[in-house]
Amino acid sequence: ETEELLKFVSLCLGVSPIYRWADPLACHAYNVMKPNGILPWHFDSCEFTLSLMIKKPEKGGIFEYCPFIREPGNENFEEVKKVLDGDRTKVRQLNLEVGDLQIFKGRFTLHRVTKVEGKTPRYLCIPAYVLDPWRVNTPEHSKAIYGKVLPIHIERNEIRSDGLTD
């Protein structure tokens, strides 16, 4: 939450200004994946995500991604469908170790986490950053991920300036 971290992420990306994600349910996200858990293919609602591996599972839990498969104004459904249908041509893997830090553009990068295997859960700290300080998750996204919708999700539910679907 520090200004130093915000500046660090901004400098690494070469993008300024950026803002902390305003969504009260998603702004301080921690991801815990229990054994047999998976995170399916998806795009983030925010432009930038920082991922810090806290605890690694014994096996699995690999971050897979297709960088920049879509861009503002272009969902690129054809290429996304290929990946969802099993085409791994554009898929890359990143096997994060404890302490590894990655910054990625999850709004434009299709990504997932493979099945966590063994008895050890996967713990990740994932603060998020946006170009628009007003944006929050859509009500549908919030309900699907966090199990609830807050008034702010309804108040700020609008078409995204980049024309992409959350």
Where are these regions (language model features)?
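Catalytic core of Fe(II)/2-oxoglutarate
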Residues: P67, G73-D166
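Catalytic core of non-heme Fe(II) oxygenases with the double-stranded beta-helix
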Residues: K7-I103, R107
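A short, highly charged nucleic-acid-interacting micro-segment common to nuclease
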Residues: E1-E3
